[in-house]
Amino acid sequence: MARGKIQIKRIENQTNRQVTYSKRRNGLFKKAHELTVLCDARVSIIMFSSSNKLHEYISPNTTTKEIVDLYQTISDVDVWATQYERMQETKRKLLETNRNLRTQIKQRLGECLDELDIQELRRLEDEMENTFKLVRERKFKSLGNQIETTKKKNKSQQDIQKNLIHELELRAEDPHYGLVDNGGDYDSVLGYQIEGSRAYALRFHQNHHHYYPNHGLHAPSASDIITFHLLE
């Protein structure tokens, strides 16, 4: 029984389509290689799958560029002409844009104004005024920030100065430094400035021989003070 003719149409199943593509691609490359070996032909095949994956075959001892150049020479068709024209058009547009920008910069510097009519001059004037307004607003904002920063610094310095003055006033009223309580054991230290730059620490030491009869406390006396040399 003769085999029925296979209908050529798109394979809907993606997996089957990919398998068929791989098999037929390998078969095509095999035939191209046979043509190269058997017939001394130069063959170049460029293929893209449905997922845009590139596959290509090129005969040994040649390149794709050589094949394309040979095709252009024999067929008298410039493959790169269209691409070159596009590149030239892009270059022309970029040069035109560059010239316009240079002209606008010069006009904002007061140059190239003779070629402008009254409407263009008014439009340029409005643009410059808006620019000046934005610059002034930014300048005032920057100055305001600097003023606020300076005020905060001055306030901090004033607070430090007030604290120092307050401390000096306290020391002027009482040359002794503050008595430090030492957890209820009555051993305390006084800072005392005497004899120029010499500093001494005076420590009260509990003396059990001095006793307050009414309160059950020992009273400090001269013998309870111990002097330690601190600085010289």
Curated annotation (Swiss-Prot):
Mutations in AP3 cause transformation of petals into sepals and stamina into carpels. It is found in: Nucleus. InterPro entries: MADS-box/MEF2_TF (IPR050142), MEF2-like_N (IPR033896), TF_Kbox (IPR002487), TF_MADSbox (IPR002100), TF_MADSbox_sf (IPR036879). Changing residue 61 to D: In strain: cv. Corsacalla-1. Keywords: Activator, Coiled coil, Developmental protein, Differentiation, DNA-binding, Flowering, Nucleus, Transcription, Transcription regulation. Signal peptide: none annotated. CDD domains: MADS_MEF2_like (cd00265). This is Floral homeotic protein APETALA 3. It comes from Arabidopsis thaliana. Probable transcription factor involved in the genetic control of flower development. Is required for normal development of petals and stamens in the wild-type flower. Forms a heterodimer with PISTILLATA that is required for autoregulation of both AP3 and PI genes. AP3/PI heterodimer interacts with APETALA1 or SEPALLATA3 to form a ternary complex that could be responsible for the regulation of the genes involved in the flower development. AP3/PI heterodimer activates the expression of NAP. AP3/PI prevents GATA22/GNL and GATA21/GNC expression. Changing residue 212 to C: In strain: cv. Li-8. Residues 84-174 form the K-box domain. Residues 3-57 form the MADS-box domain. Expressed in petals and stamens. Changing residue 115 to K: In strain: cv. Chi-1 and cv. Gr-3. It comes from the Eukaryota. GO terms for molecular function: DNA-binding transcription factor activity; protein dimerization activity; RNA polymerase II transcription regulatory region sequence-specific DNA binding. The keyword Transcription regulation applies. Forms a heterodimer with PISTILLATA, capable of binding to CArG-box sequences. AP3/PI heterodimer binds AP1 or SEP3 to form complexes. GO terms for biological process: cell differentiation; positive regulation of transcription by RNA polymerase II; specification of floral organ identity. One of its GO terms (cellular component) is nucleus.
